[in-house]
Amino acid sequence: MEMKPKYNPREVESGRYDQWVNSGYFKAKDDQSKETYTIVIPPPNVTGKLHLGHAWDTTLQDILTRMKRMQGYDTLYLPGMDHAGIATQAKVEAKLNEQGLSRHDLGREKFLEQAWDWKEEYANFIRQQWAKLGLGLDYSRERFTLDEGLSKAVKKVFVDMYNKGLIYRGEYIINWDPIARTALSDIEVIHEDVQGKFYHFKYPYADGNGYIEIATTRPETMLGDTAIVVNPNDERYKDVIGKTVILPIVGRELPILADEYVDIEFGSGAMKVTPAHDPNDFEIGNRHDLERIIVMDESGKMNDKADKYQGMDRFDCREQLVKDLEAENLVIKIEEHEHSVGHSERSGAVVEPYLSTQWFVKMKPLAEQALNNQKTDDRIDFVPARFEKTFNRWMEEIRDWTISRQLWWGHQIPAWYHKETGEIFVGEHEPEDIENWVQDEDVLDTWFSSALWPFSTLGWPDVEADDFQRYFPTNALVTGYDIIFFWVARMIFQGLEFTGKRPFNDVLLHGLVRAEDGRKMSKSLGNGVDPMDVIDEYGADSLRYFLATGSSPGHDLRYSTEKVESIWNFINKIWNAARFSIMNIGEDFTVEQVDLSGDLSLADKWILTRLNETIENVTELSDKYEFGEVGRTLYNFIWDEFCDWYIEMSKIPMNGEDEAQKQITRSVLTYVLDNTMRMLHPFMPFVTEQIWQNLPHEGETIVKAAWPKVNEALVFDDSKETMQQLVEIIKSVRQSRLEVDTPLSKAIPIFIKAKDENIKETLLNNSNYIDRFCHPSELTIDTTIEIPEKAMTSVTTAGEVVLPLEGLIDMDKEIARLENELLKWEKELDRVNKKLANENFVNKAPEKVINEEREKKQTYQEKYDGVKLRINQLKA
């Protein structure tokens, strides 16, 4: 495709992805001569559109895999999706509800058919979104958490853990959704601050002598109270420990027990214990062997243990119960109280802590294994490193994990109950006399199968599988810091338990994508951004570059349309520079003609030197995952140096008569642009492919081109200082012209008083650049120059730049400008003098740093003296 005058992302990106995929560029090659690099995509839920967080995740992963492919690795970027138990089931049920049906009307088998249809529809939609983002995925290895291979892995893990005593069935307090009627994982519970009430009640002593004050936010749970606890160190209650109180309304006697869990400073210092409806109370109940009384059913209605409140909704019961207590003069006070209340992410229901018989994973031994691994050479590196402390803290404080869910969509638990004896059979296959058994109806928590993702996707439990042998462990996991516990930690302990290896070498953690004002993006706030809309407007390359470079590891990213647009402008700049270069290189120029051994100009040497420095910096920063710094490095090199300076300087030989110099310039343009496109390619795959295809090149695609390497033969350190001097001179002339409102089209004399003979010779040898950028009517460069009385002077590192001002300037204005400049150098001198006078700095700082400060002092002093001299001259 040709380079059209205007950059149009839709035209550039159209059809390119299909060409890459159909050509097999993203397929892992199983080339034994190459080192492997593997990333398995964090599987998105098959519930709808990908959000900006997914786009951020996958862009970073794609950058890493594209870069490693170019660096010669056998690269596998494995795609896949998650069945997302409750989320998908809720969507399918909502669709059925629109038809006036429930899942129970269909039955389990028919409902699951509907769920699989949903999965197929949305899986295609997700693939389309991956394509628009340009992700280099190996679709021949795509996996799904409910596919046959992963189901086999899930069954084996469950059975093995059960046989090891790591999975058990028992009673525990879980998060319960009374609308969806299922247990929830902690990540499926959204905590919101709500305005509620704090109720203070009287619990009368059984002996009739007074009462003890109890406070609660959930009065309806008091019907299940089985004790009162106080802190044994609380002087107020030492004499009542062992006594009993009467539970209001119900009349049940409750013992007063001592437990150090109670906070003496909070409320009255006495706490009711409801072991069946609060996780902390459950633990207290275990310590004191208390009865567990469940007072609600699975729908959130009060059950037969709730006496006269049976059949009432829990919140209606709360209201009536408080009225009844008021009637009996047992309410001390009711306070307004803002507190955090958990809501189901899917149904919106207020989550009920609920005692239920569920399947659990015994976490302590698994957590200890993960913690111990972090003390070995096989440890996992967290980026940023501070998140290892977060990981360790969660592992140390871990509780057993509820893994059963009262759903139909998911991995059905491989456990069967004997119809007559109640015996439990757990196995990878059903019992032989299946007619005597019934399978557990529950399914496993989605995170159970997701925890096996890095190795189950590669063929495990077949440890001889080619992909498992070659591509596991994986190299990097890229994900948000908000799921370190829910997913990252679980993959780590399952990887160690079942493969004996860490599942990935590095964990790169990013933050949340926030709205521009810093608020979290959400449907309720209406501030969400669809990444596909951004791509339609600005192109995938603009969005990818913004996501990759807009933040540093571990930090949140604020979405900004203005910043995406500025990157679109950056790509426009690249496009225009490339188009100019390609037009000047010419169609007949081939890659074999690139020759950098000839008589290189200063500009050639400088841009080649800066290119090599940029290659080195970008490679090092990428290896550290510092993509924000990579973005700044590439932006500065491409925009500030290649486009603004070298492209303009290349016009001198290209517009000249010297064919040899033209050929050298073509070589430099080709070499620099080719290497720059390769560096940019992982970030901006579409536009770089388009430009690269129009350059003289070897190979069929930039996807498979080699990553740039530093070429020491093309590093000319002296060129940087000379170019800096020239750029300073050119900028000072342009600034001076601006200040006196003199356009570049008007030729004026320019005098340069060089610091010494060497600088003078260098400037004379490169005066063509000053001519090109400054348009002087005459240019004088010498070490001694008689400066006109009325002149504008700028002090640069090369010397003084003088523009005669006769008829051009207001003298008073120029003196004021110079006095401001003098003040600037005075402040810099004061700062550096204080630093060098600081004994602590001089004694502790490295010698190199001290010398740099001394050099700064000398430079500032020279500039200060030069400006002061000009002020005196003008005033005279």
From Swiss-Prot:
Its EC number is 6.1.1.9. It catalyses: tRNA(Val) + L-valine + ATP = L-valyl-tRNA(Val) + AMP + diphosphate. A motif ('KMSKS' region) lies at residues 520-524. SUPFAM superfamilies: Anticodon-binding domain of a subclass of class I aminoacyl-tRNA synthetases (SSF47323), Nucleotidylyl transferase (SSF52374), tRNA-binding arm (SSF46589), ValRS/IleRS/LeuRS editing domain (SSF50677). This is Valine--tRNA ligase. One of its GO terms (biological process) is valyl-tRNA aminoacylation. ATP binds at K523. The keyword rRNA-binding does not apply. Keywords: Aminoacyl-tRNA synthetase, ATP-binding, Coiled coil, Cytoplasm, Ligase, Nucleotide-binding, Protein biosynthesis. One of its GO terms (molecular function) is ATP binding. NCBIfam families: PRK05729.1 (NF004349), valS (TIGR00422). Belongs to the class-I aminoacyl-tRNA synthetase family. ValS type 1 subfamily. It is found in: Cytoplasm. The gene is valS. A motif ('HIGH' region) lies at residues 44-54. PROSITE patterns: AA_TRNA_LIGASE_I. Monomer. Gene3D superfamilies: HUPs, Isoleucyl-tRNA Synthetase, Domain 1, Valyl-tRNA synthetase, C-terminal domain, Valyl/Leucyl/Isoleucyl-tRNA synthetase, editing domain. Residues 806-876 form a coiled coil. InterPro entries: aa-tRNA-synth_I_CS (IPR001412), aa-tRNA-synth_Ia (IPR002300), Anticodon_Ia_Val (IPR033705), M/V/L/I-tRNA-synth_anticd-bd (IPR013155), Rossmann-like_a/b/a_fold (IPR014729), tRNA-bd_arm (IPR010978), tRNAsynth_Ia_anticodon-bd (IPR009080), Val-tRNA_synth_C_sf (IPR037118). One of its GO terms (cellular component) is cytosol. Catalyzes the attachment of valine to tRNA(Val). As ValRS can inadvertently accommodate and process structurally similar amino acids such as threonine, to avoid such errors, it has a 'posttransfer' editing activity that hydrolyzes mischarged Thr-tRNA(Val) in a tRNA-dependent manner. ValRS has two distinct active sites: one for aminoacylation and one for editing. The misactivated threonine is translocated from the active site to the editing site.
